[in-house]
């Protein structure tokens, strides 16, 4: 399994256990779903709890958590402060500068850096459109939530599909470290 970690805080933000695709060579999108499960239980996509010997209802004292599977699995924390347009724009400006510096440090070519600088503004602007922006949710990893660094803000958007509204997690590829587990 591949774990996608924030390059600045080392927070786990996603994994390849979710359907994923790379958009425009720039943004990883992870498809999630709403789940209800016992607190602390991590269920990987495609797992079948009944086939793994789990009992049904074991009592009423059990804590249940509800939410998006990738948010629960990676213990992401919702951050409402980024719902303010000015705050989010300011964050994006400083974060993208850090990403470019990271790309330079990691030995990316000038062509790769120029391509990133050319493409990323269009993605940010697409998020900022009024109708889209008010529908977004923003999450951060545990270390960033504890004040241990300033890293990537995970953007979640619900999209209408045949099955209803489906949550998608969007992360900037160049600000992630892929770690094999």
Swiss-Prot record:
Primary location recorded for the protein, binned into one broad class: cytoplasm
Superkingdom classification of source: Eukaryota
Keyword Calcium: yes
Alphabetically ordered keywords of this record: Calcium, Cytoplasm
Molecular-function GO term, any one: calcium ion binding
Subcellular compartments: Cytoplasm
InterPro entries reported for this sequence: Mss4-like_sf, Mss4/transl-control_tumour, TCTP, Translation_control_tumour_CS, Translational_control_tumour_p
Gene Ontology CC: one annotated term: cytoplasm
Boundaries of every TCTP domain copy: 1-181
SUPFAM superfamilies: Mss4-like (SSF51316)
Function noted in UniProt: Involved in calcium binding and microtubule stabilization.
Family, similarity comment: Belongs to the TCTP family.
UniProt name for this protein: Translationally-controlled tumor protein homolog
Organism for this UniProt entry: Brugia malayi (Filarial nematode worm)
